[in-house]
A protein has these predicted regions:
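N-terminal presequence-like segments and the immediate start of the first folded domain
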Residues: 3-9, 14-75, 79-92, 98-144
């Protein structure tokens, strides 16, 4: 009896596994590639998870001006959203990583211009250093 139940459960999982895989889509904006071993975005069941986006352009350059760096990070997020046929209005959660708390007000002004009401939830964390040379990295989750 126990073996029969186990067999049924295993069979059900094997049948369901392709359905889960079929709903997963890797999102890569045209003309870009991730800077490491990760996906820029993963869309699964209508939810888009975007990896941390730094303020660097497609050539890997980071603007000297912090405001331009923030805008570039948000533009990079916008490119992933667009590739997934979403907009900033679909974003439900944001995590911002800054290397300097004194730059929070400037980041916040630019952020406020990008995300309109109702704004997504947000956590902002000050870190000692990012993996790359930038001063900001932003991760978002969006839902259609």
């Amino acid at each position: 009896m126990h073996t029969t139940k186990l067999t049924i459960v295993v069979a059900a999982l094997l049948v369901a596994a392709p359905a889960f895989a079929a709903d997963l889509k890797i999102i890569v904006p045209p003309g870009t590639k991730p800077g490491g071993n990760y996906s820029q975005g993963i869309l699964i069941d209508g939810t888009l998870y975007i990896s941390g986006q730094a303020g660097e352009d497609a050539a890997g350059r980071i603007p000297a001006d912090f405001g331009a760096e923030v805008k570039q990070a948000l533009d990079n997020i916008g490119a992933v959203l667009k590739a997934a046929e979403m907009t900033p209005a679909d974003v439900v959660s944001v995590q911002v990583y800054l290397t300097d708390a004194a730059r929070f007000p400037q980041m916040n002004v630019i952020y406020t211009g990008y995300f309109k009401e109702p704004r997504p939830t947000r956590t902002t964390v000050v870190v000692a250093k990012l993996v790359g040379p930038g001063n900001i990295e932003i991760t978002v989750t969006a839902r259609k």
